[in-house]
Structures are given as C-alpha cells and as structure tokens.
C-alpha cells in the first residue's frame, strides 16, 4: 500500500538532480569534441594502462555535466566501454568502467539502461559476481589464518579494489532496475535474485563490520530499492535464512562507520518489511528518526558543493599526470561525501512520503486494529513535518511537492481543517507562485498540491467569511486564478498535468458564492467538449466534472450559469454528437478499459441531460 518509490523512472537526475544542464552551441560543441573529448576517448585504447586510467577517470568527471555527457554519448562512449574496457587487463579500469556505466544508467535512465540490458550486460555482471564470491571466500579464509606480519600495500590495495568492484556491480543492478520496468521485472526473477543473494550472503559471511561503509550502504540500498518495488522480493528475502537474520538484527550499531545514509536506509528497510503491519506509534518514531538522521545536513551548502565542481584539465607530462590523478581522487572523495548527503535527503523525503501514505491507508482501512490516530502523530503531521518540508522545499522541490500532496490529502481524510492560518497561507503562496522552470514533475506536483489545498480549505464547497485563512489567500471569486489554471492546461500536452488542471478547476468551480469564476470554468469545459481531436481521457474527465459541478439546482451558480447560459442545449446539440464520434475512435481491442470508461461516461451524460431537463421543467 505504502511502497516507497525511491525515485521516478521518468526522472534522469538521480545522480545529480541539482546540477544545471550545460549550454548548447553547435560550434562550441564541435570544438569541445575535437580538442577535449576525442583525445580522451582515443586514450581509452592506449597501450599504456596509466593513460587509459587517467582518460577514464577524466571522462567519469566530465559525465557529471549533462551537456558533456550527451556529447560523450554521441561519440559512442557506452559501446567503447562495453567492447574495450570491461575486459581490460587492468583491474582498476574494469572496476571504474562498471562504475561509469552505473553513473550513466542513473543519469540517463531508460535509454542507457535498456541499451546495456540488450547488450547482455547481465552476463558480464554475473560472471564478475562469481569472481567476487570466490575472492571474498579466499580473503575470509586467509584472514582466519595466523598473521605473522601486517598486510602489505599490495594486499590492502587488492582488498580495496575487491570491495569497490562489489559496490559498483551491486549499484549498477540498482541503476538498471530503476531504468526500466521491463528490466526490473527480469531482475526480480528467482534465478537472478538468487545470483544477487549469493554476493550479498558472502559479504555478510565475511563480516558487516569489516566492509567499507559505502559497500554496506550499497547493499542496504539494493535491499531497500527492490523491496520498494516488489512484495515478491520481500518474500524472497524473508525466506532466505541468512538475509532474514541479518534484517531482524539490522541497526546502525552493526557498522562502526554508520552515517546518515546508513540510518535512513535502515529505517526505509524496516518500513518496507513492516508495511501495513506498522503501528501509528512506529510511524511517528520512524518520521522523527529519519529527520534526525539528516538534521545536520545543510541543503544550501550541499547545493553549493555539488554545483561547483573543480575543473580538471588534461595532463601534458608525467608530473602533470600525477597531479591530475591526485585532483581526481580528491574530487571523487568530496563528491562521494556530497552524494551520500544528497541521497540521504532524497530517500528520507521519499520514506516520509510513503509513511504518510501508510497512515492514510491504515486510517481508511476497515480492517485496521487501531481506531484513532494518536495525538503525538497528529502533532508530528501538523506541526513538525510542515516545518521540515518548508526547509527542504527550494532544494528538493519535486520530491517535497509529492510529500506535501500526500500530507494535505491526509489532512483532508482526517478533516483537519483547523490548521494554522499562517501555515495555510504560506503553503498556498508557495504552491501558487512556484516557478516550475519547465520541469514537468514540478508542474504536476504543484497542481496536485493546489487541488488538495482547495479540498482542504473548502471542504463543503462553502466560503466561510469569518475564516481569516480563506480571506488571506484571496481566493473568493478569483477569475484570474481560474484563467491561470486554464492557461496551464492549454500550454501543456501532458495527460497527467491536464487531468490535474481539470481537478483543480472542478473543485474551485464548486465553491459557492463566486458566480464569475464558475462561469469562466463552466464555459471552458463546455467549449472544450465541443472540440475535435481532444483526447478521450480529457473528454471523460471534463464531462464527469460537469456532472459534479452542476448536479444540483440548489447550487447558487446553477441558475445563472448552467440554465441561463444555455449549457443544456449545448450538451444535447453539440457535446453529445462530438463525444459519440470521439469515443467511437477508441479501439476496444487495444484499450478495453478506456473504451469501457467512454461507454460509462456517455451513458451517464445521457442520464444527466434527462435529469437536468426534468429539473428545469419542475422549477419552471
């Protein structure tokens, strides 16, 4: 019910959602490709391992810039990695190559992920899984023998490389699973799950406390991520004795270097495996625990750290090569620290959003054992969480809007209309004035919040003049607001966004005491329903909205708008023929569900027309 979606598959900004896209200038691009990128790509084929290594590291850094990444992808970066580097004689290069593929999969989402999958990347992953299991087993056996002297530099480096390799492979699996639902479904097959479990089990046998914290977090991330997508995966884990024991005792105390990401992931795993069995008290404690884990992260400083990378130029001599390597290592260390903080906040927001959804599901479930939501949780939801969301709103806008959306709808379900007037006013100002900057996810999230807020502020479709919060938001008979939503609908072609615009307009139109605003919305709906080439989903949504808005003659806007505006004759003479024609074009075989919705809508429209005709004759 409350499965926490860690990130959207439509989003290609997991690795660095804060970085702005680079500029696009064809002449500059040609110059950059010829003078900067091609030499690096050519060095990937150099016979000198050090040249290949420096080139690969430099390319990895460049790929963090969206524009540079696109240029490199156009120059066939992925095929070069697959064909030349995954089987390189230098182990460091192989390990880093898988890491770069992971980054590209996270950044580019579907396109790169599906290309890798169709190029049989899973075979490379599993063959290296086998090597990792063997190496871990040998390492564990060697460490159990009496050590006459401390491990040498080569052994320490070999162990580091092994752990980095496991980290990159497991995180690549996570990246691929997030790139495509088809890939996810294949990864979740029993045979592939068992291959993944073999690696994780060997890591646990080696000793959690001896693993680098990054690898431990990656292991937790994989469990959290796949459990957020599949109940079957949870069953697989629960049926695995070693993994089940590990999760039963899972706590930050297991690892001496546990950080904010460790703590958030552990809470996330607990939430996924408890799901609807979770109590209200556990929900409350989990929210506070997650927020406490990220409390010391400054989102403003985090943005500055991520958006201001160092410039790493090409090496011109042996001494320069050494300096470049040092620069790259320093940069990677700082970047890794920033990305841990970034991912911690991302997952924390998603987890809180999922917990809110679970609370709503439990409250609405007739099978729930808990009748009332305790006062402590109510206080967390109404006072604590809004403060947290407001702190993070400017940096993690898209995610926070989803969190706000869930929280406001929960307020609606709980009939929590007596919220702080200051909170309502501040939140309304934020979502209505938010600059989406052509980010579709922000536009959809913003419109969803506006819809939920209207439901919260006007629960019965009535304006209460003594309510200062309603006066402060200046929403009574605001035709300009209605026109703004209509423009948003007309200027965008995304179905989900358009549907949310209709929901906002429909809810606003039903508020009595504002004839002008209702007229603006009613005429827009009626005119749209007479137009050709409107998607059937939109026609259905608008028609159903008309049923709700004008379903009762007692509404103060019914007589001046619906009756005197001649809506009934327009419905009979123009809308019915248009909908009949448009709905006929929906293929029953290709889209049976939509066809059924069209049929239901048309049938209801016929009944609605007859109802309004009888209503008018009765009132005359």
UniProtKB/Swiss-Prot annotation:
One of its GO terms (cellular component) is cytoplasm. The keyword NAD does not apply. GO terms for biological process: protein import into nucleus; ribosomal large subunit biogenesis. It is found in: Cytoplasm; Nucleus. The keyword Repeat applies. SUPFAM superfamilies: ARM repeat. GO terms for molecular function: unfolded protein binding. Residues 1-32 are annotated as: Disordered. Its main location: cytoplasm. Gene3D superfamilies: Leucine-rich Repeat Variant. It comes from the Eukaryota. InterPro entries: ARM-like, ARM-type_fold, Nuclear_Import_Ribosome_Adapt. Keywords: Cytoplasm, Nucleus, Protein transport, Repeat, Ribosome biogenesis, Transport. ARM repeats lie at residues 25-64, 66-106, 181-221, 258-299, 340-386, 435-470, 471-510, 564-607. Present with 2600 molecules/cell in log phase SD medium. Belongs to the nuclear import and ribosome assembly adapter family. Nuclear import adapter that specifically recruits the two functionally and topologically linked ribosomal proteins RPL5 and RPL11 (encoded by RPL11A and RPL11B). Guarantees that this cargo pair remains bound together from the time of synthesis in the cytoplasm until delivery to the nascent 5S rRNA in the nucleus. Forms a heterotrimeric complex with RPL5 and RPL11A or RPL11B; interaction of this complex with KAP104 allows the nuclear import of the heterotrimer. Component of a hexameric 5S RNP precursor complex, composed of 5S RNA, RRS1, RPF2, RPL5, RPL11A/RPL11B and SYO1; this complex acts as a precursor for ribosome assembly. This is Synchronized import protein 1. It comes from Saccharomyces cerevisiae (strain ATCC 204508 / S288c) (Baker's yeast). The gene is SYO1.
């Amino acid at each position: 019910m409350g499965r926490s979606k860690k990130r959207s598959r439509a989003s290609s900004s997991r690795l660095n959602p804060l970085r702005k896209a680079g500029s696009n200038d064809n002449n500059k691009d040609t110059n950059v490709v010829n003078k900067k990128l091609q030499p690096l790509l050519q060095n990937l084929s150099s016979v000198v391992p050090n040249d290949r290594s420096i080139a690969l590291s430099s390319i990895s850094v460049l790929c963090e810039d969206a524009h540079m990444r696109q240029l490199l992808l156009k120059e066939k970066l992925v095929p070069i990695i697959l064909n030349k580097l995954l089987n390189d004689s230098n182990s460091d290069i192989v390990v880093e190559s898988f890491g770069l593929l992971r980054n590209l999969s996270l950044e580019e989402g579907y396109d790169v992920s599906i290309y890798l999958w169709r190029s049989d990347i899973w075979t490379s992953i599993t063959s290296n899984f086998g090597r990792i299991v063997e190496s871990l087993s040998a390492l564990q056996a060697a460490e159990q023998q009496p050590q006459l002297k401390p491990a040498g530099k080569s052994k320490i480096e070999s162990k580091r490389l092994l752990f980095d390799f496991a980290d990159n492979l497991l995180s690549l699996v996570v990246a691929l699973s997030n790139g495509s639902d088809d890939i996810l479904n294949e990864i979740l097959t029993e045979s592939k799950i068992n291959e993944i479990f073999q690696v994780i089990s060997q890591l646990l046998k080696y000793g959690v406390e001896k693993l680098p914290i990054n690898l431990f977090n990656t292991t937790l991330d994989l469990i959290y991520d796949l459990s957020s997508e599949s109940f079957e995966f949870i069953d697989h884990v629960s049926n695995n004795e070693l993994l089940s024991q590990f999760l039963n005792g899972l706590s930050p105390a297991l690892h001496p270097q546990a950080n904010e990401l460790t703590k958030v992931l552990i809470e996330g795993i607990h939430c996924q495996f408890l799901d609807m069995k979770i109590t209200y008290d556990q929900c409350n404690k989990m929210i506070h625990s997650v927020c406490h884990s990220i409390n010391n992260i400054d989102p403003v400083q985090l943005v500055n750290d991520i958006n201001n990378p160092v410039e790493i130029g090409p090496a011109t001599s042996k001494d320069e090569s050494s300096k470049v390597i040092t620069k790259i290592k320093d940069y990677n260390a700082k970047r890794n620290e920033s990305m841990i903080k970034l991912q911690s906040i991302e997952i924390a927001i998603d987890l809180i959003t999922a917990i809110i959804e679970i609370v709503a599901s439990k409250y609405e479930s007739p099978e729930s054992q808990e009748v009332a939501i305790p006062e402590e949780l109510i206080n967390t939801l109404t006072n604590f969480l809004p403060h947290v969301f407001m702190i993070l709103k400017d940096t993690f806008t898209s995610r926070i809007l989803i969190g706000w959306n869930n929280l406001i709808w929960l307020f609606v379900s709980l009939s929590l209309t007596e919220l702080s007037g200051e909170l309502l006013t501040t939140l309304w100002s934020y979502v209505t004035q938010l600059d989406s900057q052509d980010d579709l996810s922000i536009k959809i999230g913003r419109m969803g919040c506006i819809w939920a807020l209207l439901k919260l502020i006007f629960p019965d479709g009535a304006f209460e003049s003594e309510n200062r919060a309603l006066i402060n938001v200046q929403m009574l008979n605001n035709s300009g607001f209605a026109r703004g939503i209509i423009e948003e609908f007309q200027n965008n072609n995304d179905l989900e966004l358009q549907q949310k615009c209709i929901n906002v307009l429909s809810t606003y139109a039903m508020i009595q005491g504002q004839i002008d605003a209702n007229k603006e919305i009613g005429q827009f709906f009626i005119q749209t329903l007479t137009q050709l080439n409107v998607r059937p989903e939109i026609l259905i949504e608008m028609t159903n909205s008309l049923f709700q808005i004008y379903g009762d003659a007692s509404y103060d806007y019914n007589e001046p708008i619906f009756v005197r505006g001649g809506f009934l004759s327009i419905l009979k003479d123009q809308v019915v023929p248009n909908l009949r024609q448009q709905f006929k074009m929906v293929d029953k075989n290709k889209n049976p569900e939509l066809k059924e919705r069209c049929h239901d809508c048309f049938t209801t429209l016929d009944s609605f027309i007859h109802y309004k005709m009888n209503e008018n004759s009765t009132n005359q």
